[in-house]
Amino acid sequence: MSKLFWAMLSFITRLPVPRRWSQGLDFEHYSRGIITFPLIGLLLGAISGLVFMVLQAWCGAPLAALFSVLVLALMTGEFHLDGLADTCDGVFSARSRDRMLEIMRDSRLGTHGGLALIFVVLAKILVLSELALRGEPILASLAAACAVSRGTAALLMYRHRYAREEGLGNVFIGKIDGRQTCVTLGLAAIFAAVLLLGMHGVAAMVVTMVAIFILGQLLKRTLGGQTGDTLGAAIELGELVFLLALL
């Protein structure tokens, strides 16, 4: 289990992980790592929250929020933000399904993707600033948001098909079963409840689950399935929805 955790941490983040800690794990077994997603999110959110706490006393909530969001993006290699931008460029192009998928593969940033990035990043900064002004525990809120967003991403993997012929998203999409999905969501719910002292965190998670489930169905109808980009988009939007639900 520990080897699986380190493999997933290396796979979906840019945090340094010694190679020997995950050696011997076959790539085809990576789908089992979905149950570690909430724990990895918890770690990422806690680090981002610590950045906020350290900087808030020095430069105030808005700048602390700016740098905490920046650190969170850097720790993930901006993969999720890139997925959000690519998904929006493709889906909002109003082209055929195949053309949408081609646009999503294009490394160039389009208008829709750029607007989505600006909106999500600014929204996170503003919501974190508002939560701080209301006296909410930012470290716990960020840790829970990152855990829940990565946990609810399982809703885009279970009983979904991969929309492309090949790609990294194919490691998880359509490869996890109901038990793994329930365990992943259960862990995310436990983290949210413990960190935010009960039903407040669970209620925010329920809102996030509903939003991500609807997003998954819309993307399935539009693209014919999911991709690594749509998983990244779901994680970014899941973080934002969870934080908004805490207001």
UniProtKB/Swiss-Prot annotation:
Cofactor dependence: Mg(2+)
The answer to whether the entry has keyword Zinc is no
The pathway where this protein functions is:
Cofactor biosynthesis; adenosylcobalamin biosynthesis; adenosylcobalamin from cob(II)yrinate a,c-diamide: step 7/7
GO MF annotations in UniProt? adenosylcobinamide-GDP ribazoletransferase activity; cobalamin 5'-phosphate synthase activity
Q: Which InterPro entries match?
A: CobS
Q: Name one GO cellular component term.
A: plasma membrane
Which catalytic reaction applies to this protein?
A: alpha-ribazole + adenosylcob(III)inamide-GDP = adenosylcob(III)alamin + GMP + H(+); alpha-ribazole 5'-phosphate + adenosylcob(III)inamide-GDP = adenosylcob(III)alamin 5'-phosphate + GMP + H(+)
Q: What is the recorded function of this protein according to its Swiss-Prot or TrEMBL entry?
A: Joins adenosylcobinamide-GDP and alpha-ribazole to generate adenosylcobalamin (Ado-cobalamin). Also synthesizes adenosylcobalamin 5'-phosphate from adenosylcobinamide-GDP and alpha-ribazole 5'-phosphate.
Q: Which PANTHER family match?
A: ADENOSYLCOBINAMIDE-GDP RIBAZOLETRANSFERASE
* Name of the featured protein: Adenosylcobinamide-GDP ribazoletransferase
Please tell me the species this chain comes from.
Shigella flexneri
Recorded name of the encoding gene = cobS
